[in-house]
Amino acid sequence: MSRYRGPRLRITRRLGDLPGLTRKAAKRSNPPGQHGQARRKRSEYAIRLEEKQKLRFNYGISERQLVRYVKKARSLEGSTGTNLLKLLENRLDNVCFRLGFGPTIPGSRQLVNHGHVTVNGKVLDIASYQCKPGDVISIREKKGSKKLAEGNLEFPGLANVPPHLEFEKSKMSAKITGKCEREWVAIEINELLVVEYYSRKV
């Protein structure tokens, strides 16, 4: 399953607020489709599926990519759910989003893919790159790159930069000083339900 490229508000009406996907809020709280009918009680499977979809749409990844992240999270020490969130938070496109370089994760991915971002002084156009402590993430020293980021920094998608990102706004550069803690993950998600969803599938 590839990345979703349809109407984003349709997704947020169904799944709730997804700060990585869009900064717009759905005007109607009811899910898309026909209305007025009583909703059936959701099964445990449906609840787990919804949490999985939240994660996938918020970070803008395909089903295949998410499966790979789940497998990787299982191989690491500690809680699989927490490991999964940290892997997604460490993606270069997400780090750029958290710094305010892009208005959303898709917008930040576009900056990366078009060569506007450097890691440790070198242009890196791989949005899935796993950022690690010590990495320096910057906007490329080009007028066009700076102008794009400046416009986004005036109205960042999220108000607060996580404490593990040492950000110098004037230089449009940040150093990763540690790991992203669970409480700084922006999306409201029950990661344990995501792990349970994949328990018999992966």
From Swiss-Prot:
Segments forming domain S4 RNA-binding: 90-152
Family: Belongs to the universal ribosomal protein uS4 family.
Quaternary structure, from the entry: Part of the 30S ribosomal subunit. Contacts protein S5. The interaction surface between S4 and S5 is involved in control of translational fidelity.
PANTHER family in the cross-refs: 30S 40S RIBOSOMAL PROTEIN, SMALL RIBOSOMAL SUBUNIT PROTEIN US4M
NCBIfam families tied to this protein: PRK05327.1, rpsD_bact
Species name: Prochlorococcus marinus (strain MIT 9211)
Residue span of region Disordered: 15-42
Keywords: Ribonucleoprotein, Ribosomal protein, RNA-binding, rRNA-binding
Gene Ontology CC entries for this record: small ribosomal subunit
InterPro entries linked to this entry: Ribosomal_uS4, Ribosomal_uS4_bac-type, Ribosomal_uS4_CS, Ribosomal_uS4_N, S4_RNA-bd, S4_RNA-bd_sf
Domain of life of the native organism: Bacteria
GO MF terms held by the record: rRNA binding; structural constituent of ribosome
SMART domains: Ribosomal_S4 (SM01390), S4 (SM00363)
A biological process from GO: ribosomal small subunit biogenesis
Pfam families, per the entry: Ribosomal_S4, S4
Designated name of the protein: Small ribosomal subunit protein uS4
Purpose of the protein: One of the primary rRNA binding proteins, it binds directly to 16S rRNA where it nucleates assembly of the body of the 30S subunit.
